[in-house]
From Swiss-Prot:
It comes from Exiguobacterium sibiricum (strain DSM 17290 / CCUG 55495 / CIP 109462 / JCM 13490 / 255-15). The keyword Translocase does not apply. One of its GO terms (molecular function) is tetrahydrodipicolinate N-acetyltransferase activity. PANTHER family: 2,3,4,5-TETRAHYDROPYRIDINE-2,6-DICARBOXYLATE N-ACETYLTRANSFERASE (PTHR43300:SF10), ACETYLTRANSFERASE (PTHR43300). NCBIfam families: DapD_Ac. Keywords: Acyltransferase, Amino-acid biosynthesis, Diaminopimelate biosynthesis, Lysine biosynthesis, Repeat, Transferase. Coiled coil: none annotated. It catalyses: (S)-2,3,4,5-tetrahydrodipicolinate + acetyl-CoA + H2O = L-2-acetamido-6-oxoheptanedioate + CoA. This is 2,3,4,5-tetrahydropyridine-2,6-dicarboxylate N-acetyltransferase.
Amino acid sequence: MLLTDAYEIAKFIKDAKKQTPVKLYVNGDLAGLTIEGATAFGTDQSKIFFADAGLASTFLEEYADRITEVHVEYDRRNSAVPMLDTRHLNARIEPGSWIRDHVVIGDNAVIMMGAIINIGASIGDGTMIDMNAVVGARGTIGKNVHVGAGAVVAGVLEPPSKTPVIIEDGVLIGANAVILEGVRVGKDAVVAAGSVVTEDVPAGSVVAGTPARVIKQKDEKTAEKTQLVDDLRSL
């Protein structure tokens, strides 16, 4: 389910049960020992628990005399939004990308290593979010878009009244460009690398600079330089 309203997202985060999940590796005399609500794998001498941090701490204190070795792994604290289950997406999701729940990923999209996509964002069919790019909360990315490495599509959750960023179909955003809150980038436009876009970008135009300004209309030469490679989107 896609959440697109800022107040709805804020309420979802407020009401969500905050979680600190841990992975607990334990050796010792573990026969009959369990952690409430946890999933366990292993033997009576060595187990791995997937558990809540607080309950895991209680377990370790209570059974300290029966535990010989312990190792704890965790990657979040009081987290409100889980990661999106990407197993059934018809898209290419590379390792090291972070996609939060309540995000929509279109068919044949490509999410590269280090990319971050926040709650309420939508990624269109055939769109590539390149390495270390960020799509903030409620960001709407159309079809066959390329968001370059390190680029930022600003999120709009706070203040909640702000209009989300909208990137229309066929847009190319160069590396390390920044698209600020409320901006709409028109169809088939090109945003040059390193640009900071503070105003709407007309369809079919090329913008560059800080702040970004229209420098020309997209011509045949620019189209050749910015064309997408379909093979990168094949599954």
